[in-house]
Amino acid sequence: MKKRLFLLDAYALIFRGYYAFIKNPRINSKGLNTSAILGFMNSLFEVIKKEKPDHLAVAFDKGGSVARTELFADYKANREETPEAIRLAIPYIHEILKALHIPIIEKEGYEADDIIGTLSKQAEAQNYQVYMVTPDKDYAQLVSDNIFMYRPARSGNDIEIWGVKEVQEKFEVQNPLQVIDFLGMMGDAVDNIPGLPGVGEKTAKKLLADFGSMENLLANTDKLKGKLRENIENNKEKGILSKQLATIMLDVPVTFDEADFAMSQPDFEAVGKIFDELEFRQLLQNFLKTYQPEAVVQAPPKAASGQLDLFSQGDLFAQPQLVSDKKNSSNTPHFYQLADTPMAQQLLLQSLLQQTEVCFDTETTNVNALEAELVGISFCWAAHKGYYLPFPKEKEAATKLIEQFRPFFENEQIAKVGQNLKYDLKVLQNYGVEVQGALFDTMIAHYLLNPDMRHNMDILSETYLNYTPIAIESLIGKGKTQRSMRTVPIDEVKEYAVEDADVTWQLKNVFQSQMPQVNAQKIYTDLEAPLIKVLAAMEREGVNLDVDFLKEYSKTLDADIAQLETAIAEQAGETFNLASPKQLGDILFEKLKIDSKPKKTKTGQYATSEEVLAPFAAKHKIVADILEWRQVQKLKSTYVDALPLEVNKNTGRVHTTYMQTVAATGRLSSNNPNLQNIPIRTPRGQQVRKAFIARNPDYVLLSADYSQIELRIIAALSEEHNMIESFLRNEDIHRSTAAKVFNVPLEEVTREQRSHAKTVNFGIIYGVSAFGLSAQTDLSRSESKELIDTYYATYPNLRNYINKQIEFAREHGYVETILGRRRYLPDIHSHNQVVRGGAERNAVNAPIQGSAADIIKIAMIRIHNQLQAQKLQTRMLLQVHDELVFDVPKTELEIVKPLVKEAMENAFTLAVPLVADLGVGNNWLDAH
């Protein structure tokens, strides 16, 4: 999962908050209008509470845009003076943000949108997802696959998140960059951007659809008519100027720094004092609920009589008191020791070897474990006590020191505790140390207890221990002033580092006592904990990528794109802009008349989305070519051109990271990069898999893929005998289903009938409806309903199973996999039918998908252990849900194939046999 950065446009939210209360302004007892402050803070806390961002900052205008004013002296000249209440609010908002430890980004001579635009692009380049929090539509020009507009809720409406699709629909453009042309054409009265005379929103959309850009419009005014042509020809310079003024700058001298923008704990006392001064009682409660979910707020005192004092304004705005103050290092007794001498280190090692369970945590130089160097290691085996072992900078000396502690780390009798242990294991592997012994990872344990909550240590500490850990920023600072941990005084590093191990140790005690209560102990011990080492090994191994092949394939796709464009133009009888929905719609629906009743957008333009065009692809080759053109464009940019950038310079391989604590069903997720979504459905997409190759000519790739595992699981769990019998006879389950549903002999089932049966078979897991089936096939809705009814009549136990699962979820609030993994479903009792329906579908799907995830994890652990036990050179490289990919020496192939097949097919015993299909090739495509 990518990290997420939220950037707030301060003034846009402040003005919005101020005017939201314009009819009922918030005035405190001192006569101060606090509407702007309150509105802004509500928006900020809503984002933090709802989205739980990893990184966040607030951008302010400072002195206006010098560049735009130099370009156009009257830029924003007609804006009214800022209301006094807003001017007075700004210092308070600055003060609150500083107390919250939220970065304030401003630059003299630049506007907030330029700052946010620059930071967004920088963060996107660092593999972040960026959310621009603002109601200002101008930001739509910045939207991309990883940059989104986040429009806060207003007037009872929910928040809106605009991605590429939403921008395309709302502005009727092909590319978000065309929003600049749209804004330039129609102008902006608020900012005094002139635009083109006589061009409003509707006309701007039409012109953009016809011409694609401001420049193309101005170069082809001869195609316009009447007054519009005259207006535009006489104001071409205004058009160019307006587009320049509307363009958000991307070169502001600001820098996105990961550490500087990271969310951290606020100064609760400072925030409380400011809110007390402003008389923000309710906002304080909101603040505490956002940052301290376990805090208890005490109501203000009542008058002696038990009645509220009529004349006491203090009761309305009184500062609530925290009954349970947060603990921290300064108010909690602790004893942390430094082991920085040979004698201290020897004594520490002796103590470690006497323990049965120890928590440890590494301090390093890099978040990428493959490139990280040790700065120090902290140890704890009793609450509020611990040790810090600092490491020298020189690799040789550091290796010598870690060698001294190898007997502890590789002692199988001593259990190791940590938070995100996989990272620590990989760091120690850099020094040749293989951690042994049972593993207890608090992050994974908490995921099993509460999969929908965040699992980082600071949040867990605040929630379960009522303790605020030392912020890393207090040691090394943020942004440009950030220093290396090696330069921090050793006593300060000791306090910070050992506290991490201490907190993790205490969390272990909390979670260890809770896990048996929710049936989580066994699945942790037998599955998730052993999997840590398996995933660490896979991540460290990486996979070989044929970069040269992808570069050549990129050229092939360029040629395909050009060929498709030529073919489309020939079929249309003219050249036109494929990126223009207006021109495309006119060609398809007016000139070629592919539909007698074409759908239109709200503005009257022809709809040309994939959903609209897909039904015409079979009958009209031009439509098929257009859809293919779009697919090729996306394939090239998302995979073919992007994957080579992910190759590690030191290893020459691509290293993904597998996350155990993301998907609620228990599935693994892959990121940086995501190797679980490599295309497979189309011939062109399949070529991307061809780029994943064996280590060298002496190796091959082995793919092992479970055959229809989810259908086998649902057949077994539902005890549906007809389906079980088909699997036992090793029949093609989709052909068998078609024979039963359509009442024809097995050998007479048509390809179309099998296809419909396959759609229903897989759709049943996700609660397919007649409407959904109709959309996926050529069946009418009534035919789809009849097919589903016949399906359930053929497999009656499936319907019973689905009903039982939903009833179980209603009664218990969760469902379980075959290993007891729970998926909690709080929305199962929702009064909203749509929300409740989603929970009901999850009640059916989660045990099936989760059980499949459990089974392949069992297989992965067994295979990993057997490869090690037999000292084979084969390595497991990838897990893509139901498929495993291995790098196998050709000399080991006949040993490994039966080993893998047996481990996968015997991972779990069901009423239906598990089947793993194996394939071998020099690349992933050939092996699959």
Question: Where are the regions that the model predicts?
Answer:
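Extended, highly charged clamp/arch subdomains and adjacent linkers
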Residues: M1-F60, G64-K76, L88-E95, K236, ...
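Extended two-metal-dependent nuclease catalytic cores across DNA- and RNA-processing enzymes
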Residues: K2-K3, K23-I27, A77-P253, E462-Y464
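Conserved RNase H-like, two-metal-ion catalytic cores of nucleic-acid enzymes
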Residues: F6, R16-E51, H55-A57, A73-D74, ...
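Short hydrophobic beta-strand that contains or immediately precedes a catalytic carboxylate
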Residues: L7-L8, T134, V358-F360, L439-F440, ...
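Short alpha-helix plus adjacent loop in nuclease-associated cores
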Residues: D74-L88, S144-V173, R229-E230, Y387-F405, ...
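Conserved "right-hand" nucleotidyltransferase catalytic core of DNA-directed polymerases
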Residues: N235-P392, E410, Q419, D452, ...
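Conserved catalytic core of nucleic-acid polymerases
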Residues: R483-R486, I490, K533, R540, ...
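C-terminal polymerase-core module
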Residues: A559-T566, E570-A624, A793-N845, T891-H928
